[in-house]
Amino acid sequence: MGGFCGADRGGFLALLVWLQLLQPLFSGTYKPREDSGVMHRPQRPRRPRSDPEAPAQQSRLKSLSISHPSGVPVSVDRTEIPGSGSPSGTTTKITLENRRSSLGGPFFTDTCGHRITEVDPGSLSAGRKWPWQVSLQSQNEHVCGGSLISHRWVLTAAHCIYEQEEYMVMLGDDMLHSESESVTLVPVQDIIFPSNFDIQTMRNDIALALLYFPVNYSSLIQPVCLPEEPFRVKNGTVCWVTGWGQQNEIDAGFASILLQEVQQRILLQKHCNTLFQRQLGTSKNLVIKGMICGLQDSGQSLCWGDSGNPLVCESDNTWTQVGIMSWGINCNGVPVLSVYTDIAEYNEWVSYVLSQASRMDPMGVLVLYLSLVFPLALLVAL
């Protein structure tokens, strides 16, 4: 009967000891450290509000049927959807239910939302004016935008993610397909989104992408702040959205090479719905709870390929992401209306996802497995 020789047993035991010693180093990736957790702008304590869509337990998906929009008079960037209609096997759903979670301590810091090198407002985005901006890519092509919120997490739109696709995240450069040494490419390990995301109405259009390994912050790569409840951006506030989407409807399928920026004026839902109804000849309210609306009067707008991009507002020299680009109509129209996922509505969900991830310990699971398997192997050898 074959077995392990003495040298083999010694090697196995040595490997097990090394894995146990290295476990804190590897497992530290997920711990909510001050420099690795999602970052929120500090807010004065306020009375919590009742949130009908706080998160619950997560579960692994094998398939989830999501059909393309039908009968909804909005543009949903079909040209950038790479899949056939259901999330991949590496996609996790998290149900939004009437439950709240608390996440405090190191996750809430004030080191986010800052530029290392300032650039004049209104110029093209050279020089990493927006260091949290990332490109979500598939098969070396830009699919959607996103924003870095921690060393290992990227925020984007749920409708960008479809099955049988391997995703990469590009950070550190404003040029797509740049060969600069500043470019960082990181594969995506997992993508998490609300189980009740509805592509018909674009409700709950938010997703979190987990990078395979953490990225280091620099003058080219910085996280953006997220709003804390009950933060609400005021009507008329001037904010900015950035992205590599095509610049007009004529250039279908061609992303901009250089990162673009567009100024947005925040509109109340009621006013936004009135403008949509007037343009589309409908009585339906298309902008619903969980969405915010931006207006650009000049005709410069976002277009296909801009989904998932961050809408950011500045206050006290700190940039906070208030929205995720979700949908809009008529790239070349005036005025241009764009609709964003309201991040403040999903603050608890984001915090819950990251708090659950912080409890994961893949290296610990491996050590446990080896601790069980190796003694059995040694017994067999003996």
From Swiss-Prot:
Bilayer topology annotation: Lipid-anchor; GPI-anchor
Superkingdom of origin organism: Eukaryota
GO molecular function annotation: serine-type endopeptidase activity
UniProt entry tagged with the keyword Lipoprotein: yes
Transmembrane segment boundaries: 362-382
Coiled coil: none
Protein localization: Cell membrane
Compositionally biased residues, Polar residues: 56-68, 85-95
One of the record's GO cellular component terms: plasma membrane
Keyword vocabulary terms for this entry: Cell membrane, Differentiation, Disulfide bond, Glycoprotein, GPI-anchor, Hydrolase, Lipoprotein, Membrane, Protease, Signal, Spermatogenesis, Transmembrane, Transmembrane helix
Domain annotation Peptidase S1: ranges: 119-355
Name by which UniProt lists this protein: Serine protease 43
Gene name of the record: Prss43
